[in-house]
């Protein structure tokens, strides 16, 4: 399997991927998640995708679209399964089988009732308190059986509960307190429910301390049977605590860990929202100087949460220089108390270890890829017999739709990789629709006019996406503007437009040059060319969609500029407006019932 359009070197990538269990996300050039998978051994599983033979048609189609792969390791395969399920629900990847809904994993539920029911539940969560999800129904049944043995909360349906005149078998085998016939007071039952809720929400240590006190009090009062019951409760709860593998429902928590090496840093953030929506992301902040890990985290937090929701608790791998000040700052900014901790316990301690491991692994991979980019620059110089290795590469690409909405992009790479802060887009005006030569000439003139003024850095190599004709436009501009010291190269698609068969046109040469499809120089050029194409296409689509959106609304009578703006602002975009009912549309200021019906009819004409 060969896809030279990856954002990474597959061999380098695989050599640094963890051998732990975990989850991987495959993304396209736009960052869209194409596929989410789990693995008992990430390296072993991912190596399968890079085999030259034996891949299914679906897998080959997937790998042709893959641009980047992100991994997150987990302590257990069960947790990888849960994380995979959460990510599939979140991103709805088109290469995954999207049949799983909330019925995929079971929860333990406490119903809303004067005498709540404790039971296993699978489906969309509505009324009640839900705890989970559990990795499989067997583990959930096992936990539920122990909880019923410990807390003796009723498992029966409400209809069964309200029609009892005597205790059922569950009471006889000491699995229920029989609240249906008054064998326990409402106050005592509520206290037991709270004990169960405390344990399921992670407050198990406090609960165990309380039960230990009850056991000692019963023993001191010579209530040995009662003391033995509480002792057994404590023992069973300890068993659950040790074997528990569910994602515990808790307050919103972010876990941040930093890893540093060779003057670089990776900050890994693990997000927990209500203990259910779990995802992970790696960030690589630029360091102006060597800083302690705590200082890196503190600087990162200030920027990271500037426009993001702040959770109630943040677990950190390192103490910050100003812990109290940062906590106060976040609390004021979010209007709720924010706790920072570097010494988590129980499940959060495991989350922190997992995040630290991912930070280290991602930093190693990041450093390896940077080294790989340097090697590719070196290979490029060797392939074209240049005496000096280039420092800066640029590539320009033109995109349009049947001659309309023409835009150009220019992407920049140095030996560390993409320099996205220097990327530029250009809207092309004043040319005949579809005239790519004129578009290329215009964008190169605009690009180098600024560079000659000192607004940016001159590239060493300038790639033009196109063949000999496009290269001639660039040569003409360079001669007109007296640009020197920049190597021009035209990148033409090869036979059948297949990646790896590209031809390279140089000024004043009558024949194109070629490179081996698997060479590092070829991979680098294709990577840069594809990135320029992606950047141009994304801008082109936005411009086209905006024009289509506005023109569609402009065709509706009595909808002027202010009403168009109000509609799009209220629903976010045209897609949101298309999904709205006439009643929803009337909620927009200035839109009457009659006008809402008119808008709805115009948008759905022909359906």
UniProtKB/Swiss-Prot annotation:
Residue ranges annotated for the GIY-YIG domain, each copy included: 19-97
UniProt xrefs under Pfam families: GIY-YIG, HHH_5, UVR, UvrC_RNaseH, UvrC_RNaseH_dom
GO BP field: nucleotide-excision repair; SOS response
PROSITE patterns given in the database record: GIY_YIG (PS50164), UVR (PS50151), UVRC (PS50165)
Disulfide pairings: none
InterPro entries recorded: GIY-YIG_endonuc, GIY-YIG_endonuc_sf, GIY-YIG_UvrC_Cho, Hlx-hairpin-Hlx_DNA-bd_motif, RuvA_2-like, UVR_dom, UVR_dom_sf, UvrABC_protein_C
Superkingdom of the organism of origin: Bacteria
GO cellular component: cytoplasm; excinuclease repair complex
Keyword field: Cytoplasm, DNA damage, DNA excision, DNA repair, Excision nuclease, SOS response
Domain UVR span(s) in chain numbering: 205-240
Subcellular location: Cytoplasm
Any one GO MF annotation of this record: excinuclease ABC activity
Signal peptide: none
Assembly description: Interacts with UvrB in an incision complex.
Main function: The UvrABC repair system catalyzes the recognition and processing of DNA lesions. UvrC both incises the 5' and 3' sides of the lesion. The N-terminal half is responsible for the 3' incision and the C-terminal half is responsible for the 5' incision.
Protein family according to the UniProt entry: Belongs to the UvrC family.
Protein's name according to its UniProt entry: UvrABC system protein C
UniProt source species: Dichelobacter nodosus (strain VCS1703A)
Taxonomic lineage from the root: Bacteria, Pseudomonadati, Pseudomonadota, Gammaproteobacteria, Cardiobacteriales
């Amino acid at each position: 399997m060969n896809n030279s359009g990856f954002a990474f070197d597959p061999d380098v990538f695989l050599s640094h991927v963890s051998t732990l269990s975990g989850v991987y996300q495959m993304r396209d050039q736009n960052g869209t998640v194409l596929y989410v998978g789990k693995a008992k051994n990430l390296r072993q599983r991912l190596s399968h995708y890079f085999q030259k033979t034996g891949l299914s048609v679906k897998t080959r189609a997937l790998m042709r679209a893959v641009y980047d792969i992100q991994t997150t390791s987990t302590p257990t395969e069960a947790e990888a399964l849960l994380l995979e399920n959460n990510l599939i629900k979140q991103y709805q990847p088109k290469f995954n089988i999207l049949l799983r809904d909330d019925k995929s994993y079971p929860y333990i539920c406490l119903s809303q009732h004067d005498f709540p029911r404790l039971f296993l539940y699978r489906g969309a969560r509505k009324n009640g308190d839900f705890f989970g999800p559990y990795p499989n129904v067997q583990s959930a049944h096992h936990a539920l059986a122990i909880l019923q043995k410990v807390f003796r909360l009723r498992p029966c349906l409400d209809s069964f509960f309200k029609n009892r005149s005597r205790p059922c078998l569950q009471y006889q085998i000491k699995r229920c307190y029989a609240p249906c016939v008054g064998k326990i007071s409402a106050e005592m039952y509520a206290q037991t429910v709270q004990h169960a809720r405390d344990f399921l929400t992670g407050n198990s240590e406090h609960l165990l301390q309380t039960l230990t006190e009850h056991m000692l009090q019963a023993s001191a009062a010579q209530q040995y049977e009662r003391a033995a019951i509480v002792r057994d409760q404590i023992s069973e709860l300890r068993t659950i605590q040790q074997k528990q593998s569910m994602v515990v429902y808790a307050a919103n928590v972010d876990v941040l860990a930093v890893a540093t090496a060779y003057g670089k840093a990776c900050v890994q953030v693990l997000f927990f929202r209500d203990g259910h929506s779990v995802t992970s992301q790696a960030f690589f902040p630029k360091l102006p100087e060597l800083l302690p890990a705590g200082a890196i985290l503190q600087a990162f937090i200030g920027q990271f949460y500037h426009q993001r929701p702040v959770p109630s608790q943040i677990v950190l791998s390192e103490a910050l220089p100003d812990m109290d000040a940062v906590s106060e700052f976040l609390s004021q900014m979010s209007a709720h108390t924010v706790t920072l901790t570097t010494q988590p316990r129980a499940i959060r301690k495991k989350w922190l270890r997992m995040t630290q491991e991912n930070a280290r692994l991602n930093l190693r991979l990041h450093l390896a890829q940077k080294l790989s980019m340097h090697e590719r620059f070196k290979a490029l110089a060797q392939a074209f017999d240049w005496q000096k290795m280039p420092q800066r590469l640029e590539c320009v690409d033109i995109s349009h739709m049947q001659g309309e909405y023409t835009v150009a992009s220019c992407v920049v790479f140095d030996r560390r990789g993409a320099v996205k802060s220097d990327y530029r887009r250009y809207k092309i005006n004043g040319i005949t629709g579809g005239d790519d030569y004129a578009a290329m000439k215009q964008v190169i003139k605009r690009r180098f006019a600024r560079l000659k003024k000192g607004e940016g850095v001159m590239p060493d190599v300038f790639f033009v996406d196109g063949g000999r004709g496009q290269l001639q436009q660039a040569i003409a501009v360079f001669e007109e503007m007296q640009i020197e010291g920049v190597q021009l190269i035209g990148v033409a698609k090869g036979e059948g437009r297949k990646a790896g068969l590209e031809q390279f046109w140089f000024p004043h040469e009558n024949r194109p040059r070629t490179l081996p499809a698997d060479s590092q120089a070829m991979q680098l050029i294709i990577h840069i060319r594809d990135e320029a194409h992606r950047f141009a296409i994304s801008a082109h689509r936005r411009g086209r969609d905006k024009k289509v959106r506005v023109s569609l609304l402009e065709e509706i009578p009595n909808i002027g500029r202010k009403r168009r703006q109000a509609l799009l602002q209220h629903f976010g975009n045209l897609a949101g407006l298309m999904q709205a009912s006439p009643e929803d549309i009337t909620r927009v200021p200035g839109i009457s019932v009659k006008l809402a019906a008119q808008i709805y009819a115009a948008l759905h004409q022909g359906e």
